[in-house]
Amino acid sequence: MKILIFIIASFMLIGVECKEGYPTNSEGCKITCLFNDPYCKGKCINLSTQADKKWKGVEGYCNRRDIACYCKNLPENAEVWDPNNNKCVG
């Protein structure tokens, strides 16, 4: 019985971590928003254009501190804004 509890507890501790970050526009800048969670959710989850199919995050919201869309649970190959490799010109 103790072994069964140990195995169940071990599975609960093992978490699956997904990629998170700020999606970028064509210029490499964060996608800006202002109190518009549905817009950001659409950018992260329900995008209709073929070019945006890489954004299949489960969650998306407007990060009001940075005034930019933020995505959670993105696939590992999704490109997100990187402060060390900032391509934004504006």
Swiss-Prot record:
InterPro entries registered for this protein in UniProt: LCN-type_CS_alpha_beta_dom (IPR044062), Scorpion_toxin-like_sf (IPR036574), Scorpion_toxinL/defensin (IPR002061)
Compartments, record wording: Secreted
Keywords: Disulfide bond, Ion channel impairing toxin, Neurotoxin, Secreted, Signal, Toxin, Voltage-gated sodium channel impairing toxin
Record carries keyword Signal: yes
Coiled-coil stretches noted in the UniProt entry, renumbered to this chain: none
GO cellular-component term (any): extracellular region
Disulfide bonds: 29-88, 33-62, 40-69, 44-71
Signal peptide (from-to): 1-18
Domain of life of the source: Eukaryota
Tissue and organ expression note: Expressed by the venom gland.
LCN-type CS-alpha/beta domain boundaries: 19-89
GO molecular function: sodium channel inhibitor activity; toxin activity
Chief location bin: secreted
Functional note: Beta toxins bind voltage-independently at site-4 of sodium channels (Nav) and shift the voltage of activation toward more negative potentials thereby affecting sodium channel activation and promoting spontaneous and repetitive firing.
Domain notes for this protein: Has the structural arrangement of an alpha-helix connected to antiparallel beta-sheets by disulfide bonds (CS-alpha/beta).
Similarity annotation: Belongs to the long (4 C-C) scorpion toxin superfamily. Sodium channel inhibitor family. Beta subfamily.
The protein's name: Putative beta-neurotoxin RjAa14F
Lineage start: Eukaryota, Metazoa, Ecdysozoa, Arthropoda, Chelicerata
